[in-house]
């Protein structure tokens, strides 16, 4: 088996930054997208980490802004025949797995995810084969092929509850791909978890020294942290949770100032939820010339207005998501297990 992904040494195929549009160009593409959505019987679903103007457009056109699973779930229930998925590639794949009868379009199929890239299916299969006694649980941020190998798919919003459940059944776990989220879940549940060593390029950049300095500057601020962050950052948090859970925490915490350690794309919906509170970005390591993500996923940034318009207008191999049917059927099994489990929690 080849060496597993190491976020400290990996070379990411970062995309070029999109060319900024003028005000007139933005207005032109916004109107064009609205028209094309109607003509195509399409609905737009956008992730919390996309740029604010993309989230705003999804709102204005009756679409959805949420985490990756809710995006796919919304799309499956919506009567539209076409889903425009503004996010990264695995999100489009998940939408296709749950809605095979629908046309799934993305602004670009080149929008990757460091967690997905960091868990190649060949290496992961070998890893699982080496530990056949373990139940395989994979994060939503994985390819359809990796999901197809799993017993369960999970999102950060129900990860603790699911592992608690599996641990109560005496099951030992393989967790992939995010090592930080895996360790957080392990600490919360005490489960027997063997972690794959992947990491999110955005959350892995948050460092304690810079966050401590910001905390000293704003001692009245609460710290909100996504569990994909390193353990030392999680330990500093007043609230830890998924994107939707962090937005909920922003509303319930009494603090008027919040330091947020996740992708800054979340600020659009979080600020809507708490319009009277001040939101501060948690600092990332290597700011300036050596900054890598700077608290914003470079692949999420590929979801621009021009690319969305082109996807709706052109379709084709550059924009339409396809998943092999046999692979889709296998990946659907652990996804449905998760959906059924999540339904019991809501009940």
UniProtKB/Swiss-Prot annotation:
Keywords: 4Fe-4S, Cytoplasm, Disulfide bond, Iron, Iron-sulfur, Metal-binding, Pyridine nucleotide biosynthesis, Transferase. It is found in: Cytoplasm. Disulfide bonds join 291-294. One of its GO terms (biological process) is 'de novo' NAD biosynthetic process from L-aspartate. It catalyses: iminosuccinate + dihydroxyacetone phosphate = quinolinate + phosphate + 2 H2O + H(+). InterPro entries: NadA (IPR003473), NadA_sf (IPR036094), Quinolinate_synth_A_type1 (IPR023513). The keyword Disulfide bond applies. Pathway: Cofactor biosynthesis; NAD(+) biosynthesis; quinolinate from iminoaspartate: step 1/1. Changing residue 262 to V: 12-fold decrease in specific activity in the presence of NadB. Its main location: cytoplasm. SUPFAM superfamilies: NadA-like. GO terms for molecular function: 4 iron, 4 sulfur cluster binding; metal ion binding; quinolinate synthetase A activity. Its EC number is 2.5.1.72. Catalyzes the condensation of iminoaspartate with dihydroxyacetone phosphate to form quinolinate. Monomer. Homodimer. Belongs to the quinolinate synthase family. Type 1 subfamily. This is Quinolinate synthase. It comes from Escherichia coli (strain K12).
């Amino acid at each position: 088996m080849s060496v597993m992904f190491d976020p400290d040494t990996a070379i990411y195929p970062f995309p070029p930054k999109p060319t900024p549009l003028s005000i007139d160009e933005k207005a032109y593409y916004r109107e064009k997208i609205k028209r094309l959505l109607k003509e195509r019987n399409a609905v737009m679903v956008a992730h919390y980490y996309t740029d604010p103007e993309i989230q705003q457009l999804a709102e204005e056109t009756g679409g959805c802004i949420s985490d990756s699973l809710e995006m796919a779930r919304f799309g499956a229930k919506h009567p539209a025949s076409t889903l425009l998925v503004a996010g990264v590639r695995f999100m489009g794949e998940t939408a296709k797995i749950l809605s095979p009868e629908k046309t799934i379009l993305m602004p670009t199929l080149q929008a990757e995810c460091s967690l997905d890239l960091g868990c190649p299916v060949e290496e992961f299969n070998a890893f699982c084969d080496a530990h056949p006694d373990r139940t395989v649980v994979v994060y939503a941020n994985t390819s359809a092929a990796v999901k197809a190998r799993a017993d369960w798919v999970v999102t950060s919003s129900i990860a603790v509850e699911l592992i608690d459940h599996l641990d109560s059944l005496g099951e030992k776990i393989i967790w992939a791909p995010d090592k930080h989220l895996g360790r957080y879940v392990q600490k919360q549940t005490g489960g027997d978890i063997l972690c794959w060593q992947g990491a999110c390029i955005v959350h892995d950049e948050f460092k304690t020294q810079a966050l401590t300095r910001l905390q000293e500057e704003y001692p009245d601020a609460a710290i909100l942290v996504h569990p994909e962050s390193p353990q030392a950052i999680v330990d500093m948090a007043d609230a830890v949770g998924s994107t939707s859970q962090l937005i909920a925490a922003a509303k319930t915490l009494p603090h008027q100032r919040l330091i947020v350690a996740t992708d800054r794309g979340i600020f659009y919906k979080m600020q809507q939820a708490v319009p009277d509170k001040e939101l501060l970005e948690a600092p990332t390591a290597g700011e300036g010339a050596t900054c890598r993500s700077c608290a914003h996923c470079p692949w999420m940034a590929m979801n621009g207005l021009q690319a969305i318009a082109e996807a709706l207008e052109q379709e084709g191999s550059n924009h339409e998501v396809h998943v092999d049917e046999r692979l889709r059927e296998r990946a659907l099994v652990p996804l449905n297990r998760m959906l059924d489990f999540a339904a019991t929690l809501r009940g």
